[in-house]
Amino acid sequence: MAQPIGRKPEWLKIKMASGASFAATRQLLNRHSLHTVCRSALCPNLQECWSRGTATFLLLGNTCTRSCTFCAVSKASAPPAPDSDEPQKIAEAIASMKLKHAVLTSVTRDDLPDGGANHWIATMQAIRQRTPNVSLECLIPDFQHKKAALDSVMQATPDVLNHNIESVPSLYSTVRPQANYRASLELLRYAKEQHGLATKSGLMVGMGEERHEVEATLHDLAAHGCDMVTIGQYLQPSAAHLPVARYVPPQEFEEYSTIAKNAGIRYVHAAPFVRSSYHAETFPNNLTITQNL
């Protein structure tokens, strides 16, 4: 049974890390003036990931046009224009970091006619020109479900197409008011059926959902062809954000993993600190999944 809300339980204590690799990663990102979801979203795994010489690149600036109540990324209705040099900067950073698997994500840019799709494509092209052997995992927004934008990004053939479902449908009006649960599921199905992409999604628990709702969402993801799923504990970024409803014990994450696999999801990473891109490079057969569709 979950502990009552109060002090964080032992399993949620972060082990701090630093060292030369951490400093080198930070310096490289600062030198190229790049945003990362690690820093912008206050990810609890920042120290660990940067110490391993990896990071998740945040495209289209660090200001989002949506107001998800769980997210620490800055919000505004009219963010600054995207940096046209960002694709090349990211490509250079990936080459410098010698990454074999790079993870890209972005803020949602409802203010742009294409939602930032062309910027996404330019970034993927720049990376592949600079480091053609790197595999690309793209955690995309919904682009307001505009078919032209989705098709253009999917036709750029990311090795893994990630789109987070984030939560159960009953909480959407609270945690993700400008998104649509069913439409996000359809996006994943479309990526699989129409573009033959390996698909991935993630959700957080501890936001007020019921266990049976998590199980139903995992079955929904499986039914829409999702290959990979991440499940992690929601942690409140600040007092201004959605409060944590409960701390989910590690055993429950193991149970969710079993449920997801039994539903037909091919790979599951479920644990308190798991986030969408956490150890993404270790997901087995990232490329084989695509090749064996």
Curated annotation (Swiss-Prot):
Transmembrane segments: none annotated. Residues 50-266 form the Radical SAM core domain. [4Fe-4S] cluster 2 binds at residues 64, 68, 71. It comes from the Bacteria. It catalyses: [[Fe-S] cluster scaffold protein carrying a second [4Fe-4S](2+) cluster] + N(6)-octanoyl-L-lysyl-[protein] + 2 oxidized [2Fe-2S]-[ferredoxin] + 2 S-adenosyl-L-methionine + 4 H(+) = [[Fe-S] cluster scaffold protein] + N(6)-[(R)-dihydrolipoyl]-L-lysyl-[protein] + 4 Fe(3+) + 2 hydrogen sulfide + 2 5'-deoxyadenosine + 2 L-methionine + 2 reduced [2Fe-2S]-[ferredoxin]. It holds the Pfam family Radical_SAM. It is an enzyme of class 2 (transferase). Its main location: cytoplasm. InterPro entries: Aldolase_TIM, Elp3/MiaA/NifB-like_rSAM, Lipoyl_synth, rSAM. The keyword Ion transport does not apply. This is Lipoyl synthase. It comes from Chlorobium chlorochromatii (strain CaD3).
